[in-house]
Amino acid sequence: MELYSGLDLHSRNTYIGILDPNFNRVFKKRVSNNLDLILKTLEPFKDQLKGLVVESTYNWYWLVNGLMDADYGCVHLANPS
């Protein structure tokens, strides 16, 4: 099953939501802004994730770079305005 994730990035934590193609919530969790923790949280869904969207706030660089370095090639930025 294809899955899609949105990552709502804040200064201290990230809210991760994962949806199926019918917009049913498959997973939700708030985690600390720690790349290893975020990658560990996403790992069970990695093969099914067809898109990840990160809010392009002032601090998005480390997260997007980390996701891309971990072979999440489907990372997109969303304009929060």
Residues covered by each model-derived region:
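Phosphate- and other anionic-substrate recognition elements at nucleic-acid/protein interfaces
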Residues: 1-81
